[in-house]
């Protein structure tokens, strides 16, 4: 195994040690880690406002998109001392008992974004709430519907369900719906909430709307998240 190539740099007054900038991350395009970092810098004005205040979970591809990836929630050991983090209790069960405390990274400026890009964190996952105190949940500012088609359904059927859901949301008074692709063939519909709402209220509302859609289109929609129920 060849030794790591380290490059020292400074981003907005904060020192960073970058590694293996010539490593190919996207083989088909020949994009290297340096290209990924450059891309993150270019999209930062649009990306950072969406990440600000939200604990971030990474999907990392250290050997490129053709190799295995992994999720990372806990802040990596050796993270720079200036990186802002937040400790969030992970809760389980009906009683909401805290079973673990996870220290997440907060990606809120160029330096922390470059740090994440250097880890080959090609996916940045954030919750629908912003942290208002150390680890406490703020009210939700977004409601998300995840449309995940089961075989043999494809993106075509997924788009049809998205249109039905758009109509259901319109009937419920939500005029703004922002779709985006998710995974290889899924869709997510983002619904901005203004004013913000408590998480329990948002979850109950989303489940109710999903069940209504299932009731209207039982041949095409399943509101339960169990994968074995997604029969095309």
Task: Locate the predicted segments by residue.
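Acidic, metal-coordinating catalytic segment for phosphate/diphosphate chemistry
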Residues: 17-31
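Glycine- and acidic
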Residues: 25-29, 144-151, 191-195
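Long, well-ordered alpha-helical scaffolding segments within enzyme catalytic domains
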Residues: 39, 155-174, 202-217
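Catalytic palm subdomain of template-directed nucleic-acid polymerases
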Residues: 190-204
